[in-house]
A protein has these predicted regions:
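Extracellular glycan-associated modules
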Residues: 2-231
Length: 231
């Protein structure tokens, strides 16, 4: 009989009532009912952001992989994923920005995405190296009042998680900022130098919730309060 899949919050994780202090998220198997959820440090509407994480995955071949999803009650505001053809992408409420980069693998990769609403400039960094800049969703803003789901991506049509798109591997140092970090700052973070902590989300320094959903239904954030603009 196959044992149920579990999300392991490992690497010197400390159990706490109602949550865990997360160092590394270890996802050993495909699953449609396990995920990690984070709430923002301070809810805010984002007109610019930087999202970084360290990822290692044993998944190969033609397979979609959900890495990160920021979801409000009404929509998926931001999704980061690996596409079937191996390209990395992020979605802002719709059509993706696609980046042709070396594939993710068992060796740890430092991955960062930056996006500026005013100019529309969107960039991906992999291990400190910068991609070509794309112009994407100029004028678009991420709404406040949502939550982050890691290792899963709710299907807007089926209303549940798909095990065949779940993340399998290790992830840590998930941080998000309300500004576009400079290329030199991102390279410093990749190199392990002390850099700014994420002021929107930070998995390694915050308490995060690990869940198993018996009904396989994705979570819905509570109704959002009045949004406030980021500085």
């Amino acid at each position: 009989m196959r044992l149920p899949a579990v999300v392991l919050l490992a690497a010197i994780s400390t159990a706490l009532a109602g949550g865990v202090t997360v160092k590394t998220l270890v996802s050993p198997t495909e699953t449609s009912n396990s995920y990690v959820e984070m709430v923002p440090v301070k809810p805010r509407t984002l007109r610019a952001f930087t999202l970084c994480m360290r990822v290692a995955s044993k998944l190969k071949g033609e397979r979609e992989v959900n890495l990160f999803a920021y979801r409000t009650r009404d929509s998926d505001e931001l999704k980061v994923r690996r596409e079937l053809d191996g390209r990395l992408s992020f979605y802002l409420s719709g059509v993706p920005a696609l980046f042709e980069v070396p594939p993710l693998g068992a060796l740890e990769t430092h991955l960062c995405i930056t996006c500026d609403s005013k100019s529309g400039a969107a960039t991906l960094f992999m291990d400190g190296s910068k991609s070509m800049t794309k112009i994407y969703k100029k004028g678009h803003a991420l709404r406040s009042g949502g939550r982050v789901i890691i290792r899963q991506g709710p299907d807007p049509h089926l209303g549940k998680f798909d095990a065949k798109q779940s993340f399998v591997g290790e992830m840590h140092d998930v941080n998000m900022w309300d500004s576009v970090l400079s290329a030199s700052t991102i390279r410093d973070i990749y190199s392990g130098d002390r850099g700014p902590r994420g002021n929107v989300f930070r998995l390694i320094h915050r308490r995060a919730q690990s869940h198993r959903s018996s009904g396989h239904r994705p979570p819905h954030p509570p109704p959002s309060s009045s949004p406030s603009s980021s500085p």
